[in-house]
């Protein structure tokens, strides 16, 4: 099969041939139609994580395709010909501390916190190939109205911001105000998700490109209620307070690694507001604990969501026709993908299309 792989750190991906994966009895084989590229993929290529990136790794953890083989120990939840999206965590062991903690809360096995998990596109082969082995417990059947190209970024970007949104808005009511700080691929989806869930939304970015991205939202029903230029944070704060009648926002999700953006977003919260942290700053950031104590604020981290939560996300995507702005590249352009991603004019998400939509 055709595959792209890491031949050298921080160098363009190489293209070549690899054997089609042999699936285990508890796995399915997916014919990849679309696979996304995000900042984590760049970090993998640059060997930036604590655990070294394996040379020869097939990258991409945002994968959508069609089931072409099912292991003999799999149930019938997924069948041949099903269109699916694949979350990148695979094969929870069920016995480690992370698995025990998940199951103690009443959840099914959740490989996100499993100490022995496999991670597609990070340390195990991912989606920049014609076929990939998938874990059926973290692979989701797609609604008919969700195309494979659109599904790919939902499997990481979508699942990440959706998971944060579900957590920071727990207990909120429709009509409460949610702010999204940083309007790239995650922020663009997060605003649509929040609007679909009935919240008023504030889109915040110091870049004209980010503000333009949401101003040109494909659906009027999903456009933010307020778009704010945060290059002048004092003016931006006044605009947001005026919009919320001096209360502040009920929740804010920060989709940027900027330390100043995280600090400032905390000041936007109303009493008992919640800050969702998604961007990872390059160094530790410090905050004033006084307003956290006296206004009873919360700061909440969020990993990419699990399969049950992702299923709810897909239902909302289908109902509201939520879409990413995509730059679609053919397989042969994969060696140029980093240059495309780092172009200052780039907006939205990159998807490599290996096969036509079905």
Where are these regions (language model features)?
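Adenosine-nucleotide cofactor-binding segment
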Residues: 174-183, 195-261
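N-terminal Rossmann-fold NAD(P) dinucleotide-binding loop
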Residues: 187-188
């Amino acid at each position: 099969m055709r595959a792209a792989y890491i031949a050298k750190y921080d160098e363009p991906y190489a293209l070549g041939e690899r054997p089609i994966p042999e699936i285990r009895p508890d796995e399915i084989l997916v014919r990849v139609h679309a696979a996304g590229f995000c900042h984590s993929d760049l970090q993998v290529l640059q060997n930036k994580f604590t655990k070294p990136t394996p040379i020869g790794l097939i990258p991409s953890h945002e994968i959508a395709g069609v089931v072409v083989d099912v292991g003999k120990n799999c149930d019938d939840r997924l069948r041949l010909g099903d269109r699916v999206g694949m979350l990148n965590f695979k094969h929870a062991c069920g016995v480690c501390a992370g698995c025990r903690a998940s199951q103690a809360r009443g959840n099914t096995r959740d490989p996100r916190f499993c100490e022995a998990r496999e991670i597609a596109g990070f340390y195990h082969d991912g989606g920049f190939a014609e076929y990939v082995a998938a874990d059926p417990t973290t692979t989701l059947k797609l609604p008919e109205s969700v195309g494979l190209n659109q599904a790919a970024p939902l499997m990481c970007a979508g699942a990440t911001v959706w998971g944060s949104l579900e957590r920071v808005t727990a207990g909120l009511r429709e009509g409460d105000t949610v702010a999204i700080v940083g309007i790239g691929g995650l922020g663009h989806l997060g605003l649509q998700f929040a609007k679909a869930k009935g919240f008023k939304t504030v889109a915040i970015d110091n870049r004209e490109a980010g503000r333009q991205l949401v101003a040109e939202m494909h659906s009027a029903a999903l456009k933010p209620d307020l778009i704010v230029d945060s290059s002048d944070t004092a003016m931006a704060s006044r605009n947001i307070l005026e919009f919320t009648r001096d209360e502040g926002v009920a929740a804010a999700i920060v989709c940027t690694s900027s330390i100043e953006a995280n600090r400032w977003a905390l000041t936007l919260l109303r009493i008992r507001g919640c800050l969702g942290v998604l961007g990872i700053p390059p160094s530790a950031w410090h905050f004033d604990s006084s307003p956290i104590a006296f206004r009873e604020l919360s700061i909440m981290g969020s990993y990419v969501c699990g399969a049950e939560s992702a299923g709810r996300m897909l239902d909302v995507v289908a109902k509201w026709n939520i879409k990413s702005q995509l730059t679609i590249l053919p397989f042969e352009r994969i060696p140029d993908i980093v240059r495309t991603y780092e172009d200052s004019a780039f907006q939205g998400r990159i998807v490599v299309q290996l096969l036509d939509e079905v």
